[in-house]
Amino acid sequence: MCYFISKKKGLGGFFLKKNENIRWQQHFLYPLLFHNDFYVIDPNLLFNSSPSFEKIEKLPNSFRFLNVKRSIKLLHQQNYLVYNTRSSCFNFIGKTFFFCFDIFVSTWWKHFFGFKVTFKEINQQVNFQSVFSLFLFLEEVFMFSLSFSNIRIPSSIHSELLIRRFKFSIQDVSFLHFLSFILFSKQFKFVNNSIIFPRGNVIFCFFLGNILLSIFEDFFTLRWKSCFHEKSLSYGLFSEQKHFQQKWNFLTRKPKKKDTIRLLKDFFFHYIRYGEKLILLGTTILVKKCEFFFLNFWQTYLFVLSEPSSFFLKQISSQNIFFLAYYLEYPTNSFLLRLNILDYFLSTDFVGRELNSKLSAVFVIQFLSKEGLCDIMGNPKSKLAWLSFTDNSILDKYDHFCRNVDSFYSEAINKRFLDRVKDILFLSCIKTLACKHKSTIRIVRKELGFELRKIFVRKQVEFKNKKLLYFCFHKQFRKLLFKIDLVTERLWFLDILEVNNFTKFWVKQQNALDFFFIFDQNIWFMLDQFL
């Protein structure tokens, strides 16, 4: 089933028409925006002041519909964009694409709510009293819901990761090439593996993210239904099996009317998702389960792969969650959220919650103590496992720790505690070298004073000059995304010790591949000589 855009006489606008006969367009998404009929809109829309398009940047004076038609013809030509990326028409095509994409989304939403799709009526303000008029099922759900939750998921997704995820769901190769071409164009800026979108292109980023999220929502609903219809389960302990049988016997007995109502009520939940906003409605247990799902989804599929064995949902309410390379703190901060689905709808204000990614000092000390760099109280000690290494390798390891501390923990913890962590690493390095050479700390400090100062002091100035960001959100992009002063300094940061496991695993794989390649070459060389 495919949707395409066509013009209807008498309305002066466009509508979505359903056609089941045209099957060759089933896997093609991007040609929707390159039909000539789509751009035959009212010229007064661009040049008159419209309250629904106040936030859109004004296009240059050279914007004309004849130029749009010419650019469409150039797009249909083979390999035009590949050889003419430096031309002035390339920037014009990009601006036209995102502007028409914004109109396309607004038109579809207005058609969905049952209005006449005429661009002349966009100037008229459509007033709604609440969100209930937009989503009718909320009138019944809000009254009987025990709790609701609001989650704002960041949308800083790397473009290459987006394209790889789309390969599993979209079979259209031309759409993937076109998507990669747009994301790697000059309109986007990349700062150390993080993409920064301009102001007018945030809607396009939300559109791609919502497509990915809808795919995993379908998978989540199937798993949600199967867990209630599952009869045979695998158990790790006999007590778990006995406890499950008791609960199952309690549910299968003939319940009263009140029990049946409560039992059926816990199975359903409702939510709204638009852009980066997500509103969950239901009982308290279901809301918590959905929050866990979306947190796990964000960390698993959009940043790094999580390890299920080290992830426990019961730890969320009490302490931080430790992923393979991330620390996530679940305690939330309340803030005032303004829900504005479209520009011509009234905004609704209500209090929501945000994820707090600030890390406390206790968990860092505990993690350093597990690695053997200090004790539970924070007193540094020597790393006995590194005594067999050379002095240069030991200094390189501590150098790597200090680099990651400056880059990842500069805004996550207080500056005073950051200096404390560096002092722990500094004294641990000296004690390790002193234990290896069987000397005192004072002698090691005199002999290696210059190299230690080069590692633990000069790296701060070096990182301040380069302004390395890595996986942090850019400051301007954070303000644009959240639009709240409280979260502009929040960031997601990597762990400084577990990152090496990724590189070690990758090096082992590369060494194994090189070994088999050399072994294969030697076999063919021996066969040639033998023959």
Swiss-Prot record:
This is Maturase K. Usually encoded in the trnK tRNA gene intron. Probably assists in splicing its own and other chloroplast group II introns. Its main location: plastid. Keywords: Chloroplast, mRNA processing, Plastid, RNA-binding, tRNA processing. InterPro entries: Domain_X, Maturase_MatK, Maturase_MatK_N. GO terms for biological process: mRNA processing; RNA splicing; tRNA processing. The keyword RNA-binding applies. GO terms for cellular component: chloroplast. It is found in: Plastid, Chloroplast. Belongs to the intron maturase 2 family. MatK subfamily. The gene is matK. It comes from the Eukaryota. One of its GO terms (molecular function) is RNA binding. The keyword Heme does not apply.
